[in-house]
């Protein structure tokens, strides 16, 4: 019995080990097949992504293309036996869909395919408050000089003139370049986020009709009357500010013609006149004040109840003029002037009244955004070196970072249509392989 038992035991072990070996070989074969399948499926997916990137590159060259963009069959390389077809079509007035479809013949002769869809917006309405400073063009006689500092993004459709070492804390873009290349005399500017030339022109609106329409609907429209607007923050509570409107006789309580509750839900946040507008005071609320055909005058500091850098503030102010926005030459403005708001001059500039004859007035501090047709003068300087202020104001422009959100802006503040296409969504099909 002992010999038979030993024989049976040996045969049992041999059968068991043989069965295990057979299964291990089968599993190894399946693993190899599954890996090959996964690799081919991944290639199909990557082929669709490659097609999408080719399509985007073609749109970058010509954003007006519609319909079939490309149909390519590959006969070598990683995507051998692969094909992708890319087309772009309009699916609604504001959205285009670019679709990339791949086809890959696998080693088993089966064909797999994947789809990538990229949704793009051909029109982007953006607000000018995205810029800390912007000008439509720059005068060759007006310079950024040593002592000037801008926090935030800067752009000009023209040529940027620099003398000395002004500091630009955000990226600078200049469609027309610089008066002298950075690093060559007298342009020793400090660009903290770099600079770029030859960028696309950003168009200004043809008029301020949107503000006129808003003022005539649920805002305050004063027609052809000059107005003086004094902002009053009310109490220490939030959102209880007022705007007091005076007639042409000026700052006297007897001349008040309107009291505007800025928290009134029926008020859309716009106060406007086609004539000159004079502004001062402290804002609690959301407001745009505009002179739609003339100039605006800053009579004293124009502040928010809570500083724009306070994370709890929701105050936001727009100061919009067809012509100049003028820092008045008066006692209140002769020792610094501070403005919390977004300033927009459609045809002219932000300037200091009598900038070349008034004394040295310290700093013009703007916390917000400045957009002007052409750069205006707020002071004069001796080019040195070093460049030294001789009259008017030195510029201290700080960007209100809240304005970097395109959806956050003063009521009915001017905007522009951005060029090109913006990717708003990217969708990829995902296949779950059926491994065996």
Segments from the language model and where they lie:
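Beta-strand/loop motifs with alternating small/hydrophobic and polar/acidic residues, enriched
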Residues: 2-158, 168, 433-436
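Short gly/pro/ser/thr-enriched loop/turn and capping motifs at secondary-structure boundaries
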Residues: 53, 179-181, 350-351
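Short, solvent-exposed loop/turn segments that connect beta-strands within catalytic domains
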Residues: 93, 106-112, 236-238, 313, ...
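General beta-strand recognition
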Residues: 97-99, 297, 351
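Extended C-terminal subregions enriched in glycine
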Residues: 313-389
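Compact functional segments
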Residues: 358-436
């Amino acid at each position: 019995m002992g010999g038979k038992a030993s024989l049976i035991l040996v045969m049992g072990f041999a059968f068991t080990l043989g069965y295990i070996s057979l299964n291990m070989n089968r599993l190894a074969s399946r693993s190899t097949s599954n890996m090959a399948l996964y690799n081919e499926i991944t290639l199909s997916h990557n082929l669709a992504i490659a097609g999408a990137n080719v399509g985007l590159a073609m749109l970058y060259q010509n954003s007006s293309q519609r319909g079939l963009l490309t149909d390519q069959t590959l006969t070598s390389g990683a995507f051998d036996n692969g094909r992708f077809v890319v087309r772009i079509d309009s699916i609604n007035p504001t959205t285009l869909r670019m679709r990339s479809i791949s086809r890959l013949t696998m080693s088993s002769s089966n064909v797999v395919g994947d789809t990538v869809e990229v949704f793009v917006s051909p029109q982007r309405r953006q607000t000018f408050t995205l810029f800390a400073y912007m000008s439509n063009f720059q005068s060759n006689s007006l310079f950024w000089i040593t002592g000037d500092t801008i926090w935030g993004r800067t752009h000009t459709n023209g040529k940027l003139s620099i003398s000395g070492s002004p500091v630009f804390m955000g990226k600078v873009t200049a469609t027309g370049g610089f008066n002298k290349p950075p690093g060559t005399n007298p342009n020793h500017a400090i660009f903290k986020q770099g600079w770029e030339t030859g960028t696309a022109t950003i168009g200004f609106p043809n008029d301020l009709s949107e503000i006129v329409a808003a003022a005539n609907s649920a805002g305050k429209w004063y027609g052809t009357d000059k107005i003086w607007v004094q902002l009053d923050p009310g109490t220490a509570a939030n959102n209880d500010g007022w705007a007091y409107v005076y007639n042409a006789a000026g700052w006297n309580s007897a001349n008040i013609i309107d009291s505007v509750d800025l928290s009134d839900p029926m008020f859309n946040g716009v106060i406007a006149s086609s004539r000159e507008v004079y502004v001062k005071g402290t804002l609690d609320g959301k407001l745009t004040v505009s002179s739609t055909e003339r100039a605006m005058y800053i009579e004293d500091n124009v502040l928010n109840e809570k500083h724009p850098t306070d994370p709890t503030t929701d105050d936001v102010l727009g100061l919009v003029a067809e012509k100049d926005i003028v820092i008045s030459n008066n006692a209140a403005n002769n020792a610094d002037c501070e403005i919390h708001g977004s300033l927009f001059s459609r045809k002219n500039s932000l300037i200091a009244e009598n900038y070349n004859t008034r004394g040295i007035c310290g700093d013009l501090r703007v916390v917000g955004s400045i957009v002007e047709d052409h750069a205006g003068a707020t002071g004069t300087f001796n080019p040195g070196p070093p460049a030294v202020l001789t009259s008017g104001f030195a510029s201290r422009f700080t960007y209100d970072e809240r304005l970097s959100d395109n959806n956050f802006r003063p009521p009915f503040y001017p905007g522009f249509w951005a060029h090109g296409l913006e990717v708003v969504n990217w969708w990829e099909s995902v296949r779950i392989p059926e491994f065996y």
